[in-house]
């Protein structure tokens, strides 16, 4: 279960690539989509068909019986129904907005949680300060569940650490419990493990790929 401001989609893409390369079937739920709505849901590696997604949304609308529901909530319900009906080994789940009240946080016992870099975003919903925003995202952490933390500035890191302590989560932080850096044409994880450079462009992808490796290590 992945929250954060920047790098959620990239980190999930790296995790999916590693899991599939190892022979695992991964369901994926991300947002927003770039071109087509069905890009948000992958079932065991394949994009859900538009027809299947439309049918799932109709089922969810019927089950909801006219109660108030948001666009993201009904899409999340459709994704979860699709996941329940299709065999796979793992679900990679991205928060849509914040974390504390996000529809994806209905998952009570995730295998692990991850928080990518936190910065100012969605202030009208999450709060006016970096600490408030970090607190909303840090609320995905669960008792007894490892929380893998990406690169953070001081304020978000302190909030995440405090929230983890209050919730009984186990922290696995970048530059504390694990490291990722570029050395020549390799990504070096924990100072000794060498990987090819990420296929996605930008120096920030070193940290995103490092987070993905740290998550896979803890699964």
Predicted stretch roles:
Residues 1-34, 39, 112-114:
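Walker A (P-loop) phosphate-binding motif
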Residues 21-108, 124-126, 132, 154-155:
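ATP-dependent carboxylate-amine ligase catalytic core
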Residues 15, 79, 160:
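Aromatic/hydrophobic pocket-lining residues that form π-stacking "cages" and hydrophobic walls in ligand
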Residues 1, 70, 147-150:
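Short catalytic-loop micro-motif centered on adjacent basic/acidic residues
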Residues 87-94, 110-196, 209, 213-218:
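Acidic, Mg2+-coordinating active-site environments of NTP-dependent enzymes
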Residues 26, 200-212:
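Short glycine/threonine-rich catalytic loop with a Thr-x-Gly-x-Asp
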Residues 64-69, 197-203:
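A short glycine/serine-rich beta->alpha loop
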Residues 18-22, 82, 215-219:
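Active-site catalytic microenvironments for nucleophilic, acid-base chemistry
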